[in-house]
Regions:
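Thiamine diphosphate
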Residues: 1-141
Length: 141
């Protein structure tokens, strides 16, 4: 397990200073910690596509953005990601929680299909991705 403050510290040392996204119960510790931090900014978004657009603006304004949302909202982010982020090679760190776990962990039925196709969708969008680190040692690699 990685504590939110440890993740934020490591990300800050890599230059990430602005967080954006939509509410997600799995991301609540990261969202709350980024909102409470004196050295970070958190900009709430009304949907996942807007979060990607906000991240682009943060980068163009000199910041380093982190976008956070559930994979169930990845579909909302496809167009701004492919037509803006990819086209203009804007670097962002995206954290998408995995709902509808493909390993058949119980979840809500509306998440099942997106859970199955999330990694394939990221590959189709030519997004470099990896699983979130499970502990602090993995985080610092």
């Amino acid at each position: 397990m990685i504590y939110a403050d440890k993740f934020l510290d490591e990300a800050f040392h890599l230059g990430f200073n602005t967080y954006t996204g939509v509410p997600c119960s799995f991301l609540k510790p990261l969202i709350n910690a980024s909102m409470e931090s004196d050295r970070l900014s958190y900009i709430p978004a009304v949907n996942e596509g807007d979060a990607v657009g906000i991240a682009a603006g943060v980068y163009l304004g000199g910041g380093m953005p982190v976008v956070m949302f559930q994979n169930s909202g990845l579909g909302n982010a496809v167009n701004p990601f492919t037509s803006l982020i990819q086209t203009f090679e804007i670097p962002i760190l995206m954290i998408a929680t995995l709902r509808g776990d493909p390993e058949n962990e119980p979840d809500e039925p509306q998440h099942q299909l997106m859970g199955k196709i999330t990694t394939q969708l990221l590959d189709l969008m030519q997004v470099s991705w990896s699983w979130f680190p499970e502990n602090h040692d993995e985080l610092t690699k």
